[in-house]
């Protein structure tokens, strides 16, 4: 993390270090003058400030940084030497170095970089959907074994999210993005050089495991940068990017596989693409985690003032094992006891299953029209058109939520987030019935392809609304809620990728798609139930926001 510290230290070059030095000297002089008697006025006044750190929000940093005595191991009010330590905080509510106070262009750039990482990684999840079948033929195994290449990627994605989401709260977002991305690049070499189908399956697992960081840390990055109103549009942009990757992947993979390059170039193209992304991340993407930035600030002040007493409390709480254990136990507890988490995880699982079943089902449906692998990828882009149409309505959703937010005098009501899902919940079963009963060879291929527009529209609104609602409902536990949601949706998606081909072969295209549509119909009431009774459900929950 030293290169991050160097960049961050440069940002702090404008600080009035003399003020920090003066503060250190003044407190030391007062302490020598007054002694260590905790009953003296100086200590009583300092304890009063410590107990109400927000009482001096209007002052500059030399008066707002709380002077606290701390034990490096026990967090008592005095350490073994009797010396005080000074906790580093943001200078005020408008500190320009705090991520929420950054210029809007910088926030948008950071969001776009995070979204681009998501496109690169998620494209890898589906780029091999055609190549897996051809590799299976080359290695003389069945097509279902070839589907394992996609399934193990998704299972690795699910497993990695459990590990890397809590680590981003310990070490910051940027180290996780940069380290996992470079490992992801290295494992592409293994995929391209695989000598048998089983080594390919294993490497695909590690592609997913180290590629999960964008989806694992996305909620944290967006929460770091944007207030609740701005988060409405930011999350829609990121969710659109999360779907663009899986939809663009089959187009790329189809044409690469059909060309003279062959299926191995799926991995070489990914390696080049992800490698360039890693360079962009390392040299242009800023750290957004507030506590990590305050750690850097404390480190910078210790170096520049030659005073080792500046600290941030987060520095002494870096316990990755505890963070992972807490995320696991909290996530399991939320999934087992919270109706909100159960319902919206079920919805997220359903759309992820649909997305990756489409990667198997669309080729089966459109091959009967004489499409080749590249043209089947283009057929899937109908879903992308729907996602972009849904994204184009972001200003309307933003205005709606802002009005509701202002009507409540700035108090967040999570149920206000559910408005887009009133439409999205109907779009998905309509699109599936449309696809299922127009995919006859006697019907023009454009008819089933157009159904993808409504499917994509529904995908976007379900993902964005579910994530927003979970964040607003669980606040401090939002990271755990999103972590368990990410795990369940990708684990289920990986399992269903294996059964999709037998399902379509045994039920035929029409009834297999209709079966999914009936499941979608069963999920339609969820947003309406929580819109009318969500507040009552939250008030009965020991973990959810009660407002």
From Swiss-Prot:
According to the UniProt record, where is the region Disordered? Answer: 38-89
Report how it sits in the membrane: Multi-pass membrane protein
Q: Where in the cell is it found?
A: Membrane
Q: Which GO terms describe its molecular function?
A: amino acid transmembrane transporter activity; transmembrane transporter activity
User: A single GO CC term, please?
Assistant: plasma membrane
InterPro entries, sorted = MFS (IPR011701), MFS_dom (IPR020846), MFS_trans_sf (IPR036259)
What's the domain of life for this entry? Eukaryota
Regions of biased composition (Basic and acidic residues) lie at: 38-50
Q: Which residues cross the membrane?
A: 108-128, 148-168, 174-194, 197-217, 233-253, 265-285, 346-366, 377-397, 418-438, 445-465, 478-500, 514-534
Q: Which GO terms describe its biological process?
A: amino acid transmembrane transport; transmembrane transport
Keywords, alphabetical:
Membrane, Transmembrane, Transmembrane helix, Transport
Residue stretches of biased makeup (Low complexity): 62-75
PANTHER family recorded? MAJOR FACILITATOR SUPERFAMILY, MAJOR FACILITATOR SUPERFAMILY (MFS) PROFILE DOMAIN-CONTAINING PROTEIN-RELATED
Please report which protein family the annotation says this sequence is part of.
Belongs to the major facilitator superfamily. CAR1 family.
The protein here is known as Uncharacterized transporter C794.04c
Tell me the classification of the organism that encodes this protein.
Eukaryota, Fungi, Dikarya, Ascomycota, Taphrinomycotina
């Amino acid at each position: 993390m030293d290169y991050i510290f160097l960049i961050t230290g440069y940002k702090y070059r404008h600080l009035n270090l003399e003020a920090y030095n003066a503060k250190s000297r003044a407190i030391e002089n007062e302490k020598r003058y007054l002694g260590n008697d905790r009953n003296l006025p100086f200590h009583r006044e300092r304890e009063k400030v410590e107990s109400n750190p927000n009482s001096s929000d209007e002052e500059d940093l030399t008066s707002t940084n709380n002077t606290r005595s701390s034990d490096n191991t026990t967090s008592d009010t005095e350490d073994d030497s009797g010396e005080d330590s000074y906790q580093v905080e943001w200078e005020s509510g408008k500190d320009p170095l705090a991520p929420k106070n950054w210029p809007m262009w910088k926030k948008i750039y950071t969001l776009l970089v995070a979204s681009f990482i998501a496109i690169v990684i998620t494209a890898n999840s589906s780029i091999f959907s055609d190549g897996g079948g051809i590799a299976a033929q080359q290695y003389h195994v069945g097509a279902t074994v070839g589907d394992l290449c996609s399934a193990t990627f998704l299972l690795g994605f699910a497993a990695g999210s459990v590990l890397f989401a809590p680590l981003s709260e310990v070490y910051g977002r940027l180290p996780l993005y940069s380290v996992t991305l470079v490992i992801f690049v290295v494992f592409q070499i293994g995929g391209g050089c695989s000598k048998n189908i089983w080594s390919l399956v294993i490497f695909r697992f590690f592609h997913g495991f180290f590629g999960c960081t964008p989806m694992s840390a996305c909620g944290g990055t967006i929460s770091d940068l944007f207030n609740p109103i701005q988060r409405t549009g930011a999350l829609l942009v990121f969710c659109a990017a999360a779907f663009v990757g899986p939809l663009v992947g089959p187009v790329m993979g189809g044409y690469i596989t059909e060309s003279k390059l062959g299926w191995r170039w799926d991995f070489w193209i990914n390696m080049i693409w992800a490698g360039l992304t890693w360079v962009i991340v390392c040299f242009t993407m800023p750290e957004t985690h507030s506590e990590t930035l305050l750690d850097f600030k404390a480190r910078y002040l210790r170096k520049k003032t030659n005073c080792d007493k500046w600290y941030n409390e987060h520095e002494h709480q870096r316990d990755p094992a505890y963070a992972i254990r807490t995320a696991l136990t909290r996530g399991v507890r939320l999934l087992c006891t919270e109706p909100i988490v159960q319902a919206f995880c079920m919805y997220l699982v359903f759309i992820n299953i649909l997305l990756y079943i489409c990667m198997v089902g669309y080729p089966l449906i459109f091959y009967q029209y004489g499409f080749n692998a590249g043209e089947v990828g283009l057929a899937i882009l109908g879903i992308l058109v729907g996602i972009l149409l849904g994204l184009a309505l972001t200003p309307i959703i933003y205005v709606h939520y802002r009005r509701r937010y202002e009507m409540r005098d700035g108090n967040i009501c999570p149920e206000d987030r559910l408005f887009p899902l009133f439409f999205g919940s109907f779009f998905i079963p309509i699109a599936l019935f449309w696809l299922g009963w127009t995919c006859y060879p006697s019907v023009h291929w454009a008819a089933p392809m157009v159904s993808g527009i409504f499917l994509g529209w529904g995908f976007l609104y379900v993902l964005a609304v579910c994530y927003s609602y979970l964040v607003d409902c669980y606040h401090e536990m939002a990271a755990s809620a999103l972590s368990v949601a990410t795990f369940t949706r990708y684990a289920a998606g990986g399992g269903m990728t294996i059964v999709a081909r037998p399902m379509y072969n045994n039920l035929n295209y029409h009834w297999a798609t209709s079966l999914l549509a009936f499941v979608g119909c069963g999920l339609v009431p969820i947003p309406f139930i929580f819109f009318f009774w969500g507040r009552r459900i939250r008030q009965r929950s020991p973990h959810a926001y009660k407002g």
